[in-house]
Amino acid sequence: MKTTLKLTAIAAMSAFILTGCATQDKSAEANAQLQQQAVLGLNWIQQSGEYQALSYQAYNAAKVAFDHAKVKKGKKKAVVVDLDETMLDNSPYAGWQVQNNKPFDGKDWTRWVEARQSGVVPGAVEFNNYVNTHGGKMFYVSNRKDSNEKAGTIDDMKRLGFNGVEDSAFYLKKDKSPKAARFEEIEKQGYEIVVYVGDNLDDFGDAIYG
């Protein structure tokens, strides 16, 4: 009886191990398929003239909106922008994910930020520097982590030619992802936000995202 129980236990354990291996294989295959779906999008971002033209068009429209914006007496003009895929181009990181069949991982992302190898979205530097030299102030409201991703972000943006990227201009993620509270912090400093630029509805506050 004891021998039978041992054999049954061993058989059950073997089945569990085999099932675990099969699950891991399926998971790896699913990740590979998911990452391959990003290839066309990456090619478009990195190689198409249309992407560049649309990006410049968006920033030209933002510049016009900034120039025509009026603020209440005593208020200062502010522009709020997201960073990733709005100001900074992280398509090389996405390409690495495809090549290695890797899903998003927070630790890998932090290593990418620390590597200081981001590119720039077409038109972003010109718009940023125009606002900061024409009576406005740029604020960078991003869900990059405030604790360990700010230094790499600032260094990268300085390298890419952005002006006005001092520490106080950054409102990165400390605990919560929604950005409305950070927008309010900016407004409490006497600013009126006249333009928002982003690639996600959360970049425009609760009125739109909620």
Region spans (language model):
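Substrate-recognition element of Asp-dependent hydrolases with the DxDx(T/V) motif
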Residues: 85, 124-157, 199
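Sec-exported extracytoplasmic/periplasmic mature domains
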Residues: 67, 71, 92-93, 129-137, ...
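C-terminal cap/substrate-recognition subdomain and adjoining C-terminal extension
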Residues: 23-35, 49, 145-210
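Active-site neighborhood of HAD-like aspartate-dependent phosphohydrolases
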Residues: 72-78, 87-118
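Stable alpha-helical elements in mature extracytoplasmic
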Residues: 54-62, 120-123, 127, 149, ...
